[in-house]
């Protein structure tokens, strides 16, 4: 490390001239120069940025003045801006456009970053300065946001080993380095295992039941892979879901189900030992830091506060929703037997198929009826238009802003008074270099600079939506439109941020609070007033008929029990991994024991959730998956206020903006929520919405 630092300082001028990551960003709004950045630029840029950040830390530590909020806490907050910017770009590209070269680079870069952050968190002199200011906090004249930054800085260092000494400190360093490497390896394995499966079909009876849109997409994939005249299905979300919903061939549905649910179980990309080791490391870290398990360590900094409160929520929901879920499955089995004319043992690969048929029969509604009205460009206008109607925002497409892939689009976002709010990138379609799922992220967060400028954010929405085909534009399913709204809610949280400090800005909030803005946005989708603004037939321009809108509303409670219990499965499994304190010898037995209370369909030998549970073992949701349900309680309660005042009520929207979206982590989440809602959230709103109460 010392050699790297010396080398980088001696070559700074030469490196900066050649490396676009180390020179000032001069494009509009100082956006990242993606058109100039090469993968080989990242390692030297990150090495130099680490050295620059370390020099800033050294200047804080070595100063002779007594510790103050300004010379220690604020100085620490403002340090490392170049490193933060470069690493945000790198890891976002790794997830959205991560080829083999990027993955290999990440395996070299991540240990450097972990070591660097450990060097800061475990710097005893730095922590003593932070601790001195923290202990004086009641005698200092600090603003609310400054007090929050002080508290978060102290807690952040303490929770990352700063209070440890001697062998415990070194052990923490070793464990965090290993954890970083394993999390990266886990994600890499999931992506590679997902890309490894392809099912090429050539016979007409193999594709029976599939709609033309799915066949067109599969034919295009097959052609790209050299299988002219065939149909290729894989484990990308649009391809897999269409097949599971519509394919009549039960054996082929089973084949895809098994392929998806045995990913990273055995073979070249086996994650089982990695999962066990990650859980073991997290448990040891928690013990080192004085907690009985990793869940207690995590939840100390969450709205839920402890695992008892999490389990109380999960068990309360399980008790309320499981009877409905069991009834739904029983009715679905009866439907399947009636359809087939003989007894049917409902298996996991049957659920999507028969539920799609049942839903169609009960409500005369399916995705193929709705997709012509959900053309992506129109949906985009509708989603952006909702932000205009609620908050007065406008979105101006700007093709001059550089992008990291030709399919990415960029928009300048402006407030109601015409002032610039931020940049929004959209990246909608699957590709082999992109992780599955959907997410919002940022290339730059909002903050107030040293010069007092409100530096606005650069936000990105990354999806895996159904691609356009040679004959049709991109037509979305209802669920994909809902996903768009969900991630757009996160985007608004980032775009409207108005905090002084970057670490407290936008979505940098507790995990069980961060899903409130995203899940709230989903509530508008079934509302007729909203649907009529954008749901127009892509060929005729016809507005989505009232009859279909009513059918959408009628289906809102379809299998609400099943879907809730399904989410509880993930929440229970996550909590089981992070409340256990012994090494797991049999990962399959452990998983089955954890999720047995939520099982509604037969367990299939060889399948495993944990080996591909990216939220928890590759992302930031460890001991946090319950947060989706926690936030659902919040979003139902929050939307009930919009229902009372009018779903487009500007005053209610303004209250949500001022008290939630703009505030970030500047105050405790419950304080902010109560200020918006006038009281604490009540679970009854969610249960009423779902027809459970």
Question: Where are each of the predicted segments found?
Answer:
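Bacterial N-terminal signal peptides
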Residues: 1-8
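C-terminal, non-catalytic "cap/extension" segments appended to globular domains
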Residues: 15-37, 48, 230, 361, ...
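N-terminal helix-rich structural modules
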Residues: 16-211, 642
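Short His/Asp/Glu-rich catalytic/ion-coordination signatures at enzyme active sites or charged loops
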Residues: 26-41, 90-109, 132-174, 234-273, ...
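Short, hydrophobic/amphipathic alpha-helical patches that form generic packing surfaces
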Residues: 82-92, 151, 155, 351-359, ...
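Active-site-proximal, well-structured secondary-structure segments within enzyme catalytic domains
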Residues: 149, 181, 188, 192-234, ...
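Short pre-active-site segment immediately N-terminal to the catalytic Zn-binding motif
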Residues: 466-485
């Amino acid at each position: 490390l010392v050699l790297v630092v010396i080398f980088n300082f001696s070559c700074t001028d030469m490196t900066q001239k050649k490396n676009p990551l180390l020179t000032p960003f001069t494009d509009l709004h100082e956006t990242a120069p993606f058109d100039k950045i090469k993968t080989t630029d990242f390692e030297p840029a990150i090495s130099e940025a680490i050295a620059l950040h370390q020099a800033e830390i050294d200047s804080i530590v070595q100063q002779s003045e007594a510790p103050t909020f300004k010379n220690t806490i604020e100085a620490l907050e403002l340090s490392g801006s170049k490193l933060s910017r470069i690493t945000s770009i790198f890891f976002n590209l790794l997830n959205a456009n991560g080829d083999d070269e990027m993955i290999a680079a990440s395996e070299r870069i991540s240990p450097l970053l972990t070591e660097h952050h450990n060097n800061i968190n475990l710097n005893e002199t730095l922590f003593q300065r932070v601790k001195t200011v923290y202990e004086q906090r009641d005698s200092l004249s600090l603003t609310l946001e400054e007090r929050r930054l002080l508290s978060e800085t102290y807690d952040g260092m303490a929770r990352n080993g700063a209070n440890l000494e001697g062998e415990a400190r070194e052990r923490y360093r070793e464990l965090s380095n290993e954890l970083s490497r394993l999390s990266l390896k886990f994600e890499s394995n999931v992506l590679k295992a997902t890309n490894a499966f392809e099912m090429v079909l050539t016979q007409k009876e193999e594709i029976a039941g599939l709609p033309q849109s799915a066949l067109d997409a599969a034919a295009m994939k097959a052609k790209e892979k050299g299988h002219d005249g065939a149909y290729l299905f894989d484990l990308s979300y649009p391809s897999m879901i269409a097949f599971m919903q519509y394919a009549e061939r039960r054996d082929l549905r089973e084949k895809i189900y098994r392929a998806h649910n045995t990913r990273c179980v055995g073979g070249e990309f086996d994650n089982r030992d990695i999962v066990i080791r990650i859980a073991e490391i997290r448990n040891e870290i928690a013990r080192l830091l004085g907690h009985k398990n990793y869940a207690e360590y995590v939840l100390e900094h969450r709205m839920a506060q402890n695992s008892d409160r999490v389990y109380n929520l999960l068990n309360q929901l399980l008790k309320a929703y499981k009877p409905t879920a069991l009834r739904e499955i029983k009715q679905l089995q009866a439907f399947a037997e009636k359809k087939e004319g003989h007894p049917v043992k409902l298996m996991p690969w049957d659920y999507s198929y028969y539920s799609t048929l049942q839903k169609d029969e009960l409500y005369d509604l399916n995705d193929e009826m709705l997709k012509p009205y959900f053309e992506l460009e129109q949906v985009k206008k509708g989603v952006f238009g909702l932000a205009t109607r609620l908050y007065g925002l406008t979105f101006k497409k700007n093709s001059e802003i550089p992008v990291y892939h030709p399919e990415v689009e960029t928009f300048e976002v402006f407030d109601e008074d015409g002032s610039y709010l931020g940049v929004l990138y959209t990246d909608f379609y699957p590709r082999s270099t992109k992780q599955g799922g959907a997410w919002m992220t940022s290339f730059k967060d909002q903050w107030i600079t040293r010069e007092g400028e409100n530096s606005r954010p650069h936000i990105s929405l990354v999806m895996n939506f159904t691609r356009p085909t040679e004959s049709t534009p991109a037509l979305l399913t209802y669920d994909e439109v809902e996903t768009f709204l969900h991630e757009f809610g996160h985007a608004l949280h980032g775009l409207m941020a108005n905090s002084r400090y970057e670490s407290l800005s936008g979505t940098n909030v507790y995990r069980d609070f961060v899903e409130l803005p995203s899940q709230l946005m989903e509530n508008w989708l079934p509302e007729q007033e909203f649907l009529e603004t954008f749901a127009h037939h892509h060929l005729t321009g016809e507005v989505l008929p009232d009859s279909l809108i009513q059918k959408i509303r009628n289906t809102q409670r379809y299998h609400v029990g099943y879907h809730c219990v399904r989410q509880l499965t993930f929440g229970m499994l996550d909590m089981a991994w992070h409340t256990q304190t012994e090494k797991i010898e049999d990962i399959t037995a452990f998983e089955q024991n954890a999720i047995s209370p939520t099982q509604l369909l037969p367990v299939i030998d060889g399948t495993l959730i944990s080996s591909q549970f990216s939220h928890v073992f590759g992302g930031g949701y460890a001991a946090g998956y319950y947060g989706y349900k926690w936030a659902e309680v919040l979003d139902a309660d929050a939307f009930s206020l919009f229902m009372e005042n009018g779903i487009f009520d500007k005053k209610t929207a303004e209250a949500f903006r001022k008290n939630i979206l703009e505030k970030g982590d500047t105050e405790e989440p419950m304080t902010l929520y109560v200020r918006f809602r006038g009281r604490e959230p009540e679970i009854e709103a969610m249960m009423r919405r779902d027809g459970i109460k």
